[in-house]
């Protein structure tokens, strides 16, 4: 056991930086470092997809719950902007996934991008990325397919080459797909029950979007799936 220090001086003060701001104190963002906090992190990614649907972009949201406890959320929205932002002089993927308090939902009252939105605007995607063991993001927009890979809050790839860009493989279709594994080094429990995806506030919000039903798929090791429309009364079917 380390000996307790008795000196409390100027060098005793330190600041958490980058991913450590969430990884060491997840409760500050998500309200808990337990299962509820982990569920909140999932809610943040789901709510981004639902915000797109409620604005009329995309008709289906698919949430897949894998046996290894990773989660995938895929929408048919406009696709998260991830390319270079001349105004901020940074890539948007850095702002969205690696910078707290950055996003496109701060001017809602002006009708800028969203009339209304769920979640921790400007915090959710980044905080969930920071708290994950890994995260894979794929975006289809502007005629391109953009791919990103993160591990424990950090982008993977050579500096300047983290964002992979290739011609789209979906024609004119756009959208965002996010798959990640909540990190047990951050949360004490990541075994989210299937009913959460049906009964969560995000699911209820999706059910109110009549033109955009959200579909839950529970994937098994044999790759079979069970689907149900996300509404307050729906339940996940057992494969």
Predicted regions and their residues:
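GHKL-type ATPase core
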Residues: 2-12, 69-92, 103-223, 230
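ATP-lid-like helix-loop hinge signature
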Residues: 47-77, 81-85
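Structural motif corresponding to the C-terminal cap of alpha-helices
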Residues: 26, 30, 49-53, 100-108
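Bergerat-fold GHKL ATPase/HATPase_c domain
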Residues: 1-46, 95, 109-110
């Amino acid at each position: 056991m380390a000996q307790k220090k008795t000196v409390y001086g100027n060098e005793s003060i330190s600041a958490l930086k980058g991913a450590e701001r969430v990884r060491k104190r997840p409760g500050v963002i998500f309200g808990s470092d337990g299962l509820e906090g982990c569920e909140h992190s999932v809610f943040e990614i789901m709510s981004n997809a639902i915000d797109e649907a409620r604005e009329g972009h995309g008709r289906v949201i698919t949430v897949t719950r894998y046996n290894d406890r990773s989660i995938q959320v895929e929408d048919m929205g406009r696709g998260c902007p991830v390319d270079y932002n001349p105004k901020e002089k940074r890539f948007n993927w850095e702002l969205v996934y690696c910078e707290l308090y950055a996003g496109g939902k701060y001017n809602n009252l002006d009708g800028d991008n969203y009339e209304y939105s769920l979640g921790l605007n400007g915090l959710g995607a980044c905080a969930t990325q920071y708290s994950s063991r890994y995260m894979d993001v794929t975006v289809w927009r502007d005629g391109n397919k953009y791919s990103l890979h993160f591990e424990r809050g950090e982008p993977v790839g050579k500096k300047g080459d983290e964002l992979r860009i290739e011609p789209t493989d979906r024609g004119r279709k756009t959208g965002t797909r996010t798959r990640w594994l909540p990190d047990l080094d951050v949360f004490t429990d990541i075994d989210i029950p299937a009913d959460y995806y049906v009964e969560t506030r995000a699911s209820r919000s999706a059910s109110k979007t009549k033109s955009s039903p959200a579909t839950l798929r529970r994937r098994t090791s044999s790759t079979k799936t069970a689907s149900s429309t996300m509404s307050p009364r729906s339940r996940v079917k057992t494969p």
